From Swiss-Prot:
It is an enzyme of class 2 (transferase). Disruption phenotype: Results in complete loss of glucosylceramides (GluCers) in mutant cells. Shows increased resistance to plant defensins MsDef1 and RsAFP2, and to heliomicin, a defensin-like peptide from the insect Heliothis virescens. A motif (D3) lies at residue 321. This is Ceramide glucosyltransferase. It comes from the Eukaryota. The keyword Cell division does not apply. Pathway: Lipid metabolism; sphingolipid metabolism. The D1, D2, D3, (Q/R)XXRW motif is a critical part of the GCS active site, involved in catalysis and UDP-sugar binding.
């Protein structure tokens, strides 16, 4: 009875409240609408523009790899055969150096000579070179040794000092600078000469010889890659960097042809073109590669006036590869070209396998690049997966998803980037050594090579969980490496300390 009276009273009260439009009070949380400030919106707009730019550049390179690096390379039939001088600088013993040097002797090209340049007559690498010359008596090959007591010294760059004698002594105008620690396919020289003479970049013409429109290729280079031949952290990270982030942007920038982007592992150009570029530097209109005046113009005029000595001018720079490409590009109005080939370096030396070695190598070259291409180096960390994804997620979340950071989108970004890198890694790994020319492929360049044990017999894919581990580690380390590089100017190269000056030259300490 009491319960019935209570229910009746509640019903009467509800009807009365409804009659007077009185709603019962219910406590609700006070949720403020998402309203970012004008400054944050502007920042998000800038971030999304940059995010889109990075994605466009990255996938521009990725699709070029899918198109031009995903199949067996063919051997062109050149309309005319020009002689080529192959210069291979030696400094000590590198991992699998004999196999790397042998790749020059195996080139499927009818007319070339090999000059092996050695800094000192006591260098231990001389024995390896001499054995190869005996093994290939039909190949025009010789060793040029420096004077151990009075070595060539045109500047602090030991590689240029070593190469200078071979550059001057070469029989042919076309020079192929090929480091002693890289291996190339047997058809690489033929494709490179064809690209130089017909002005091709990955098979596409860049210059109309009838109308004169476009830029003529005057430097041919090959994508640098590295294979870890032992299961060590440092070499695995190098392999991951070169097969993913570096190759993607390296190929993309080269295709866009807005500025030179060249690694010096494997470069082919005409000696007469480089001598001409140095001569023009010395005339004073553009006295140096960074626009400064003074002794650089004087030195350029001196070396440019003597045929076969233009290379010596670049001994003042640690990054001579980029500076040579810059001179050929801006002084001679040329551009660079790729051929679909790779310069493959086996990594596994005693002093190069640790995580510390990897960190020091990356810091060293970032410090060099900081002085050569400052703007690009400052922006570099924003092109890496994690930081780029952070900017992109903030921008898209702020502008479209009513939040400051949507973790679901960030994870989606990471997964797409990782799958892209995984696909690209294995496309390059599978096809880097594939050539229709007769090619003696060394074990480390075989697609199924496994540094962790027996070869991958049924698949050339790296073990996924191990691949992901090194991929994540490399991505996480990218920003700390960049910060460390930006905070210093001193570098250690070939066990020698250097400082990079504001005019881009190097000073040995």
């Amino acid at each position: 009875m009491i319960m019935q009276l209570g229910l009746t009273s509640l019903a009467f009260l509800a009807l009365k409240c409804d009659a007077y439009n009185i709603a019962p009070k219910i406590d609700t949380p006070n949720v403020e609408p998402f309203a970012p400030s004008g400054g944050l919106k502007l920042l998000a707009i800038v971030a999304i523009i940059w995010y889109v730019v990075v994605l466009l550049v990255a996938y521009y390179g990725f699709f070029e790899i899918m198109q031009k690096f995903s199949k067996r390379k063919t051997l062109p039939v050149p309309p005319q055969v020009e002689g080529v001088t192959i210069l291979r600088p030696i400094k000590g013993i590198d991992p699998e150096m004999e196999l790397c040097l042998q790749s020059a002797f195996d080139q499927d090209y009818p007319k070339f000579e090999i000059i092996i340049c050695v800094e000192s007559e006591n260098d231990p690498g001389i024995g390896v070179a001499e054995a190869l010359i005996r093994k290939y008596p039909h190949v025009d090959a010789r060793i040029l040794k420096g004077d151990s007591h009075n070595p060539d010294h045109f500047g602090p760059n030991p590689k240029v000092n070593n190469l200078a004698k071979g550059y001057s002594a070469g029989k042919y105008d076309i020079m192929w600078i090929l480091d002693s620690n890289v291996w190339v396919c047997s058809g690489a020289l033929s494709r490179s000469v064809d690209a130089l003479n017909r002005s091709l970049d990955n098979g596409r013409s860049t210059f109309d010889f009838q109308t004169g429109k476009g830029r003529k290729v005057n430097l041919v280079h090959h994508v640098p890659m590295a294979i870890s031949i032992n299961p060590q952290t440092g070499t695995n990270l190098d392999e991951m960097f070169l097969f993913t982030s570096h190759s993607k942007f390296y190929i993309s920038i080269n295709k866009a042809a807005l500025a030179p982007c060249v690694n010096g592992k494997s470069n082919l150009y005409r000696r007469s073109e480089l001598d001409l570029a140095v001569k023009r530097l010395g005339k004073g209109s553009e006295p140096s590669l960074d626009g400064t005046t003074g002794i650089l113009a004087k030195d350029a005029a001196y070396y440019g006036s003597k045929p076969g000595q233009g290379l010596r001018f670049f001994a003042r720079y640690i990054g001579e590869d980029n500076m040579i490409a810059t001179a050929l590009w801006f002084q001679n109005g040329g551009r660079t070209g790729l051929t679909g080939d790779a310069a493959i370096q086996p990594l596994g030396g005693v002093n190069s396998t640790s995580l510390k070695n990897y960190l020091l190598r990356r810091i060293r070259w970032l410090r060099v690049r900081k002085h050569m291409v400052l703007e690009a180096t400052l922006l570099e960390p924003t092109t890496e997966c994690l930081l780029c994804g952070t900017f992109g997620t903030f921008a898209i979340s702020t502008l479209f998803l009513q939040s400051y950071f949507n973790w679901k989108f960030f994870i989606f970004h990471l997964l797409v980037w990782m799958v892209t890198d995984y696909t690209q890694f294995h496309i390059l790994l599978t096809n880097a050594s594939q050539d229709t020319a007769t090619c003696n492929v060394p074990y480390f360049a075989e697609p199924n090579f496994n540094a962790y044990g027996s070869p991958f017999e049924s698949s050339n894919l790296r073990t996924f969980h191990r691949w992901v581990l090194y991929w994540l580690l490399r991505e996480v380390l990218a920003l700390p490496i960049w910060i460390s590089a930006m905070l210093g100017t001193r570098i250690i190269w070939r066990n020698r300390p250097f400082r990079i000056n504001v005019d881009l030259s190097a000073e040995e300490l």
